[in-house]
Amino acid sequence: MKKNSQIRAKIIELREKIEKWNHHYYQLQNPLVDDLVYDKTLRELEKLERENFFLFSLEELNQSPSQKVGSKITSKFEKVAHSSPMLSLNKAYSNEELEKWAKKAREILKTVTFFVEPKIDGIALSLFYQNGNLIKALTRGDGVFGENVLVNALKINDEFIPKKINYLEDLEVRGEIYIDNSTFASLQLETKKFKNPRNAASGILRRYKNHKPKIDAKSIKFLEEESDFRYLKSFFYTLVNPEKHKINSQFDSTNFLRNLGFQVNPFQKKCSDLKDVFNFISIIKQKRDFLNYNIDGVVVKVNEFSIYEKLGSTSKFPHSAIAFKFEDDIAKTKLLAIFATIGRTGKVTYNAKIEPVTLAGSKISSAILPNYSYIENLKLNLNTEVYIKKAGEIIPQIIGSVHNYPKTNFSIVKNCPKCNSELVNSESGLDQFCQNQFCPEIILQKIVHFCSKNALNIESLAQKRIEKFLEKGLISSACDIFYLKDKLELIYERLSNKNQLLTKQNASQSMQIKSIMKLLNEVERAKNIDFYRLIFGLGIRNVGLKAAKILSRYASNLSELRNLDFNLLKNQHDFGPVIIESLIDYFNNQKNSEQLNCLETVGFNFKTTFLTNQSNSWASFAISGKLSKPRDEYVRIIEESGASFHESLTKKTDFLLLGQSAGSKIEKAKKAGIKIINEVQFFDLIKNSKKT
């Protein structure tokens, strides 16, 4: 049995660890561990403190991170007291824990109902309005004091932070600021400094600028950072002192907010009992991978405000609400090995071999580690236990060590595992690259990417066959694929068993030759593709499908693309300096020029599906609600018709395509005089546009 001194030391160690994590999470926007690891550690601390409270003075117990919200404010923003504490939420990890929480509410009110909604993984923000004008915007801070980030809140799109509302009484509303996953993916092309959408939202919202720079070369970065506020979105979920506004329930509160023009999560429900609650939690859990924003659980609230005072609160969280966490996406296993692989851009990815374990219904034996800094921060040790998590990713990620270690016992890889060239660090210092253009692995991965589904879609050229063709000297680049038809004799010879040399006479009987002929037919078909697919297939660093589609509006073939002034695209369509620099570097590279020269001789017949100039679009569309097909399909139809699509409503929006469970866009569209259409009307418009 542990001595009291050992238990006290353990509690102090856990407190220091959590304080450090809190500081990095709340103040530096740089989380050191995954939420699930944090929650497990906090629960361990809470349990030890409950069982051994006598080892500490009352003052020491009150100063524990288990009793406080957030972290000490260290930023330069004005520190302002909250009108009422901005508390955190207690957590439940099982149905039994949720039932235990609900029991107290049922004892006070037998007919109690509940309100359930996803728990957005964002940044808590409290907005204050006087005479309908936004006058203050406070972050959570330490729960008692927050940072007044009004100067930044005013830069966020009106759709997500209303600057004026049609309500003259003093009003305080609270919600979450977040960046959706698709927007974050675009943002990551411009900067690698954000680890996840929450980290990005916090970094942008709490960005401190105490002056406006002169208009010179240095101002460019400032202006680009200012434009980042367009990425921020919101969901608001509660009022402070709702009874003052004659609002008696959480359900009424969200309707009140929606009617005032605030974004309210449409995926929510008033539940009559716990059975209804559990059913809705199951629905949220099933659908969360299809949401375009991250959630880290579900919030369950007592719906009736009348019993909130009787339910009370602790210094850290209210008893009127609880967060139900999804814990079954985390598993414990053993880290067996770490090895590095090289991608088509030369970027190094660290991979983990783990002891097989079942996670989210699948048997897992490998996991991904983004870079060496990640391994260092988590202090991962080979042949020790680790936590792995699967939340929408195909390959799960290691999120922490089960036990504490002073440092990792795995050394950084310094040379390319394929060509042995010395690896070079990126400007950020996070990523490593092999810069040998003749590295066999880079060449292989470039060709694999070139043939992939979203590029030229040559199914018969999977990675193993490409490896074989490279090994036999049949190809050395992606362009060589189009000239395989001129090497039939060589293919027959080099891919055949020496003892059973294939000839033209018996070739027709060979399954292998049939396979080759199928491949050649696919290669010929690949000459008739949308131009954006070839752009994507080139594998230009930081140029994904979205950027490739945009580029195809400005160039209809390789020759036009090579002569395009990419600087003209700066700050348009989310094209920032990182993408522009990548494009310029790619087209100035001698080896790439040789590849492009070859591709220009292939004889592509590109389809014309995108406008060469978006300013000539015949209409502008926005979408709200759930439609009969995936949203991406409608965006594709809109763009291919020659129209433009925007996530948010703007002055230039002509049509709002409305689906089920539409949000506040419908009210904004009505006020702005934007025509609201259903799916039938939408397809009629598209059909008629093709006739003109």
UniProtKB/Swiss-Prot annotation:
Signal peptide: none
Keywords, ordered alphabetically: DNA damage, DNA repair, DNA replication, Ligase, Magnesium, Manganese, Metal-binding, NAD, Zinc
Domain BRCT: 611-692
EC number annotated for this UniProt entry: 6.5.1.2
UniProt enzyme class: ligase
Cofactor: Mg(2+); Mn(2+)
GO biological process: DNA repair; DNA replication
Record-listed Zn(2+) binding positions: C416, C419, C434, C439
Catalytic residues as annotated in Swiss-Prot or TrEMBL: K119 (n6-amp-lysine intermediate)
Residue positions binding NAD(+): D35, L36, V37, Y38, D39, S88, L89, E117, R140, E176, K301, K325
Reaction it catalyzes: NAD(+) + (deoxyribonucleotide)n-3'-hydroxyl + 5'-phospho-(deoxyribonucleotide)m = (deoxyribonucleotide)n+m + AMP + beta-nicotinamide D-nucleotide
GO molecular function: DNA ligase (NAD+) activity; metal ion binding
Pfam family, one: DNA_ligase_aden
Keyword Ligase: yes
Known role: DNA ligase that catalyzes the formation of phosphodiester linkages between 5'-phosphoryl and 3'-hydroxyl groups in double-stranded DNA using NAD as a coenzyme and as the energy source for the reaction. It is essential for DNA replication and repair of damaged DNA.
NCBIfam families referenced in this protein's UniProt entry, alphabetically: dnlj, PRK07956.1
Assigned protein family: Belongs to the NAD-dependent DNA ligase family. LigA subfamily.
Protein name as catalogued: DNA ligase
Organism of provenance: Mesomycoplasma hyopneumoniae (strain 232) (Mycoplasma hyopneumoniae)
Taxon lineage: Bacteria, Bacillati, Mycoplasmatota, Mycoplasmoidales, Metamycoplasmataceae
